[in-house]
Amino acid sequence: MKKILLVAFVLTMSWHLNAQLNIDSLSHINYQQLHGADLNDVWGYEDEMGNEYAIVGTSKGTSILDITNPTAPVEVFWHPGTESIWRDPCVYGDHAYVTTEANDGMLIIDLSPLPQSTNLPVSVYTGPAGQTWTSAHTCFCDSQGFAYIFGANRGNGGVIILNLNADPMQPVEVGVFDNWYCHDGYVRNDTMFLGHIYDGFFSIVDVTFKANPQLLATQVTPSLFTHNIWPSTSGQYVFTTDEVSGAYIAVYDISDLNAIHEVERIQNSPGAGVIPHNTHVKGDYLVTSYYSDGIVIHDCTNPENLVKVGEFDTYNGQTTGFDGCWGVYPFFTSGTIVAADITEGLFILGPTYSKGSYLKGNVTETGTNVPLGGVEVTLFNNPQPDNTNNSGDYITGIYHTGQANVLFEKVGYAPFSTTVNLVQGQEIVLDVQLTPLPPFNVQFNVTDASTGSPIFDAKIKLVHPLIVHQGATNALGEEQLTLFYQEPYEIYTGKWGYMPYCSSQTIDPSTGVINVLLQPGYGDDFELDLGWSINSTAQTGIWERGVPNATSSGSTVQADVPWDCGSSCYVTGNDANLHPDFDDVDQGNTVLVSPPMDLTGLTNPHFNYARGYYNFYGPQLVDDTLKILVSNGSQTVLMDQVVPPLGDSMQWEYKSIALNGLLPITSTMQISVVISDEDPDINITEAAFDEFYVTNYSVNGLVALQQEIKVFPNPAHTEVTFLGSFTNEDYAMFDGMGRCVQQGVCSEETLTLSVVDLEKGLYLLYIGDSRIRFIKD
């Protein structure tokens, strides 16, 4: 193939200048313009004359670039292939091996004619007769002349071991390790390190005898989606990535294979949900392709104290999805790095490897000298603070030289701040002592608003920026707490058979007692566990209560219902992985069932709730239905259902359904939310459920998206004011049993109502198509 000088496609020293640290842009190749292709992984090759080449896997084939002059790359070879988003190269000697999931087999390229000739011989390998395979996820070539194929479409998709020594163009299969699917791996000498992504762990395997690999150890990783693994230069540690939103680069001490343990973890952009992809060890540094954060370099001189010392953002934006830098190769003799960004092309980069500044020490209690574990240590506004261990020891670091502030914080202790003088490449020792805060006590009394009787086992959740307490009342309706912070707290209280309560209150030593009145009724905003049960046969996507995690396709809700208490709801599967097919309902059903309800005292009972549903994609029929059932203890009927396909982003829908006419009303009424995705027609199937409550009337037409309403005071004693734009709007106020206690028409934009004559408890005010809760104390 004729060499192509990439003048038209090279941009030098101009890419994302505001998102780089110790890495310079040397050139950039736009593969959309060159081949109309996205990029996958990348590897490197050096010929006998020292020329350097990038071997680039693209969605439409394999490209080889001469990058000996990194500011003027030249494409010297192009081999088209079946389109695929996975194409992964590795190199042994003078041969490149390229796997793909496009059923093209493994492409083998003879690189030995370079640089004199670009007419490079190729062959395709698909395995021995009777044991063929045509696709694989990745590959790796060790230093002893063996290639390791990961994730092939044969068996479990484990590891296939090929001997390249006799004829590199015609490999010979010599071994298999097929205990689990393997996504990626690394081999040093006779030890194989494997990432089992769908099983959530890594394994270490002895491959001294290639025909008989021996499992040595396994270890789960933080997000249970182990994508990539690489050992330290010393072999004492391994570094791993989980390919999920907000995951970590994690470090494990493997010096004792019977006691592997995590010693460090780090994120590049805490709180942003960015996904790490592939990490590589280069001496005392980790070089990681980090999707929408580009590439990141960490100083791993001490693997138990990773310090970010370099970054280059290849992707113009930051997402929680699979956008940005897929692969990176940092092993050229020249030091040049090549980074493959999926949509933005290939970046040729010049790094400056620099050391971090390190800080360590011990934290004890003032007066007693007792070591303090769990102390948060924040160095120079580092968004990833360290924590002391049980012995009070900490170690941290940052890329900074000179004066730096250090903040030490622990619940129950006064924070301590000081300044240290950091020196690049050196470890400074700083021991400190923390002084205990004076504790104070507060007591919660939870009583029935109608009878004044104490409520046993009422759930209490207290939320402060530094603590979350969850407890329950005793037989006297009391719970006593010891607190340290004289600050505002969020308070959530509830029990099945009562309407939920939430408020915000400053608690200090003068507070003494907090009285909470719960209004009889049935309601649940799912901030507390009030006893709903879950029955499931599904393998994934089981109902769970929590703050919903979004997916990349919008297949679940972004947040709970906006106007109820707290931020939790029930969702089917709530893993942080953004892929919509990772934790959706599969291979069975999952059923959410309420505790029983005595509704015999209501004349017109209605079940009110918010639901979300998504059912789309899949190679077969999109055929799953969300069903909501009502039971009276002896009879069950279908009350509500949603049929597919529903491919738009999941949104909350509000329902108010009359029970009269469906079945007799009893003292053992229950609601069930049923969703399933059965073989063989597996789809992406998700559901969400929130803000359940029972009324003695219909709220249809009153549950549209609310305008923002401000209410004060809340709780109210004599009168309550609602701020909004309510002129000429109808309003109605209901107690927890669904009885209308006030109604009328707003004459002004704000609405002020007297509540002097109302019983204590929770009330709902409807104004037009809006509503808000408030408490009468």
Residue ranges and their predicted role:
Residues 6, 376, 703-712, 716-777:
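C-terminal outer-membrane/trafficking sorting elements
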Residues 19-367:
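Feature marking well-ordered beta-strand scaffolds used for ligand recognition
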Residues 42, 522-581:
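Extracellular glycan-recognition surfaces and repeat-rich motifs
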Residues 349-367, 435-443, 521-525, 586, ...:
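Residue-level detector of functionally pivotal "anchor" positions at catalytic/ligand-binding pockets or at interdomain
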Residues 359-374, 443-456:
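Structural motif
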Residues 368-373, 378-399, 454-456, 464-480:
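Short, acidic Ser/Thr/Gly-rich low-complexity loop/linker segments typical of extracellular
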Residues 393-405, 411, 478-490, 496:
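Short Pro-Gly-centered beta-turn/loop motif in secreted/extracellular proteins
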Residues 585-588, 620-621, 677-696:
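Extracellular carbohydrate recognition
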